[in-house]
């Protein structure tokens, strides 16, 4: 299960408190803001997952960096809805991480799919 900067607030507590039994990877911005409960719910969900789980928070990114918006228009930068990491490399690098995660858990291809991303982008990674 892969989640790109998804919102956990509307997810019912039964799911948050049970977690899931399949591998899980969350990749997203460093913060949703000081009043958001999103990461509190994500952390509880992560703790309750019953398989490998990752939380990758990338500093200087925003929600729309995890979409195709940077390819479509430079308007995101002007409106300040894209972070500083938005550039022509971020989406391809993000795609490599996504592909690496799925290759590991669907094809048993055990290459280190986080290492290059971690070297290039200021990020925090939580794994269990």
Show the residue positions of the predicted features:
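Alpha/beta-hydrolase-fold serine-hydrolase catalytic core, especially in secreted/extracellular enzymes
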Residues: 60-128
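The feature captures the conserved acid-bearing segment of alpha/beta-hydrolase catalytic domains
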Residues: 1-63
